[in-house]
């Protein structure tokens, strides 16, 4: 990673990003031929970080997800929601074919980014957790039609952060500090087909069986979380989860 914490006091602007990453790829050519709505969403402004999760700038979703920029060290903030029903079944989604990154792959309930807006940006861990919870409410409604009233802010539980990097197709990829959020709720779905192709609820046993099915493809971050921590957390969902909450250290994957 080429950034250092010495830059964290700079104003969070596009101009500061160009100073930090003078060779950053800002071209629009990679978006040619993709779905119009997904192209529009690539203009959303993500929070760019140093390796300690301190905001150092902003950049569009497109810029953050180009492998040419990821290979230069560009890192951004993200979140992953794991929503369980009252049977402790986990809601999965299959990403839509229209998605530019990781299309058609199965993943956890919702995976996205807090935006550089006052309600979702934070420089302290406490403020950052609050920001990703608000972002999670926003995206659960956008992707799955889940109303905020069914997923109250105070019902989200923050577990930890993971820092990982994963290519998608050679052109696109992920390099994120990902906030892991659990919530238990029975919800009504109204799927946005431009975002989500399918959904299903799984048990730990059925999910492990699906991992052995070569016809099913899962996102790399979901597999990382499953292979390292998820099943232990899941086992303690109703009793004992407290000891896993609010981890301060970033897990490097």
UniProtKB/Swiss-Prot annotation:
Which catalysed reactions does the entry list for this protein?
A: isopentenyl diphosphate = dimethylallyl diphosphate
Q: Where does substrate bind?
A: 61, 94, 99, 112
NCBIfam families for this protein: IPP_isom_1
Arranged from A to Z, the UniProt key words for this protein are:
Isomerase, Isoprene biosynthesis, Lipid biosynthesis, Lipid metabolism, Magnesium, Metal-binding, Steroid biosynthesis, Steroid metabolism, Sterol biosynthesis, Sterol metabolism
The record ties this protein, via CDD domains, to: NUDIX_IPP_Isomerase
The cofactors named for this UniProt entry are: Mg(2+)
Say what the protein does.
Isopentenyl-diphosphate delta-isomerase; part of the second module of ergosterol biosynthesis pathway that includes the middle steps of the pathway. IDI1 catalyzes the 1,3-allylic rearrangement of isopentenyl (IPP) to its highly electrophilic allylic isomer, dimethylallyl diphosphate (DMAPP). The second module is carried out in the vacuole and involves the formation of farnesyl diphosphate, which is also an important intermediate in the biosynthesis of ubiquinone, dolichol, heme and prenylated proteins.
Entry EC no(s)? 5.3.3.2
Please report the name of this protein according to its UniProt entry.
Isopentenyl-diphosphate delta-isomerase IDI1
GO terms in the biological process aspect are: dimethylallyl diphosphate biosynthetic process; isopentenyl diphosphate biosynthetic process; sterol biosynthetic process
Bound cofactor: record note: Binds 1 Mg(2+) ion per subunit.
- Which segments constitute the Nudix hydrolase domain? 74-224
Q: Which organism is it from?
A: Gibberella zeae (strain ATCC MYA-4620 / CBS 123657 / FGSC 9075 / NRRL 31084 / PH-1) (Wheat head blight fungus)
Residues annotated as binding Mg(2+): 65, 76, 174, 176
Choose one Gene Ontology CC annotation of this protein and give it: cytoplasm
Motif mapping: Nudix box: 112-145
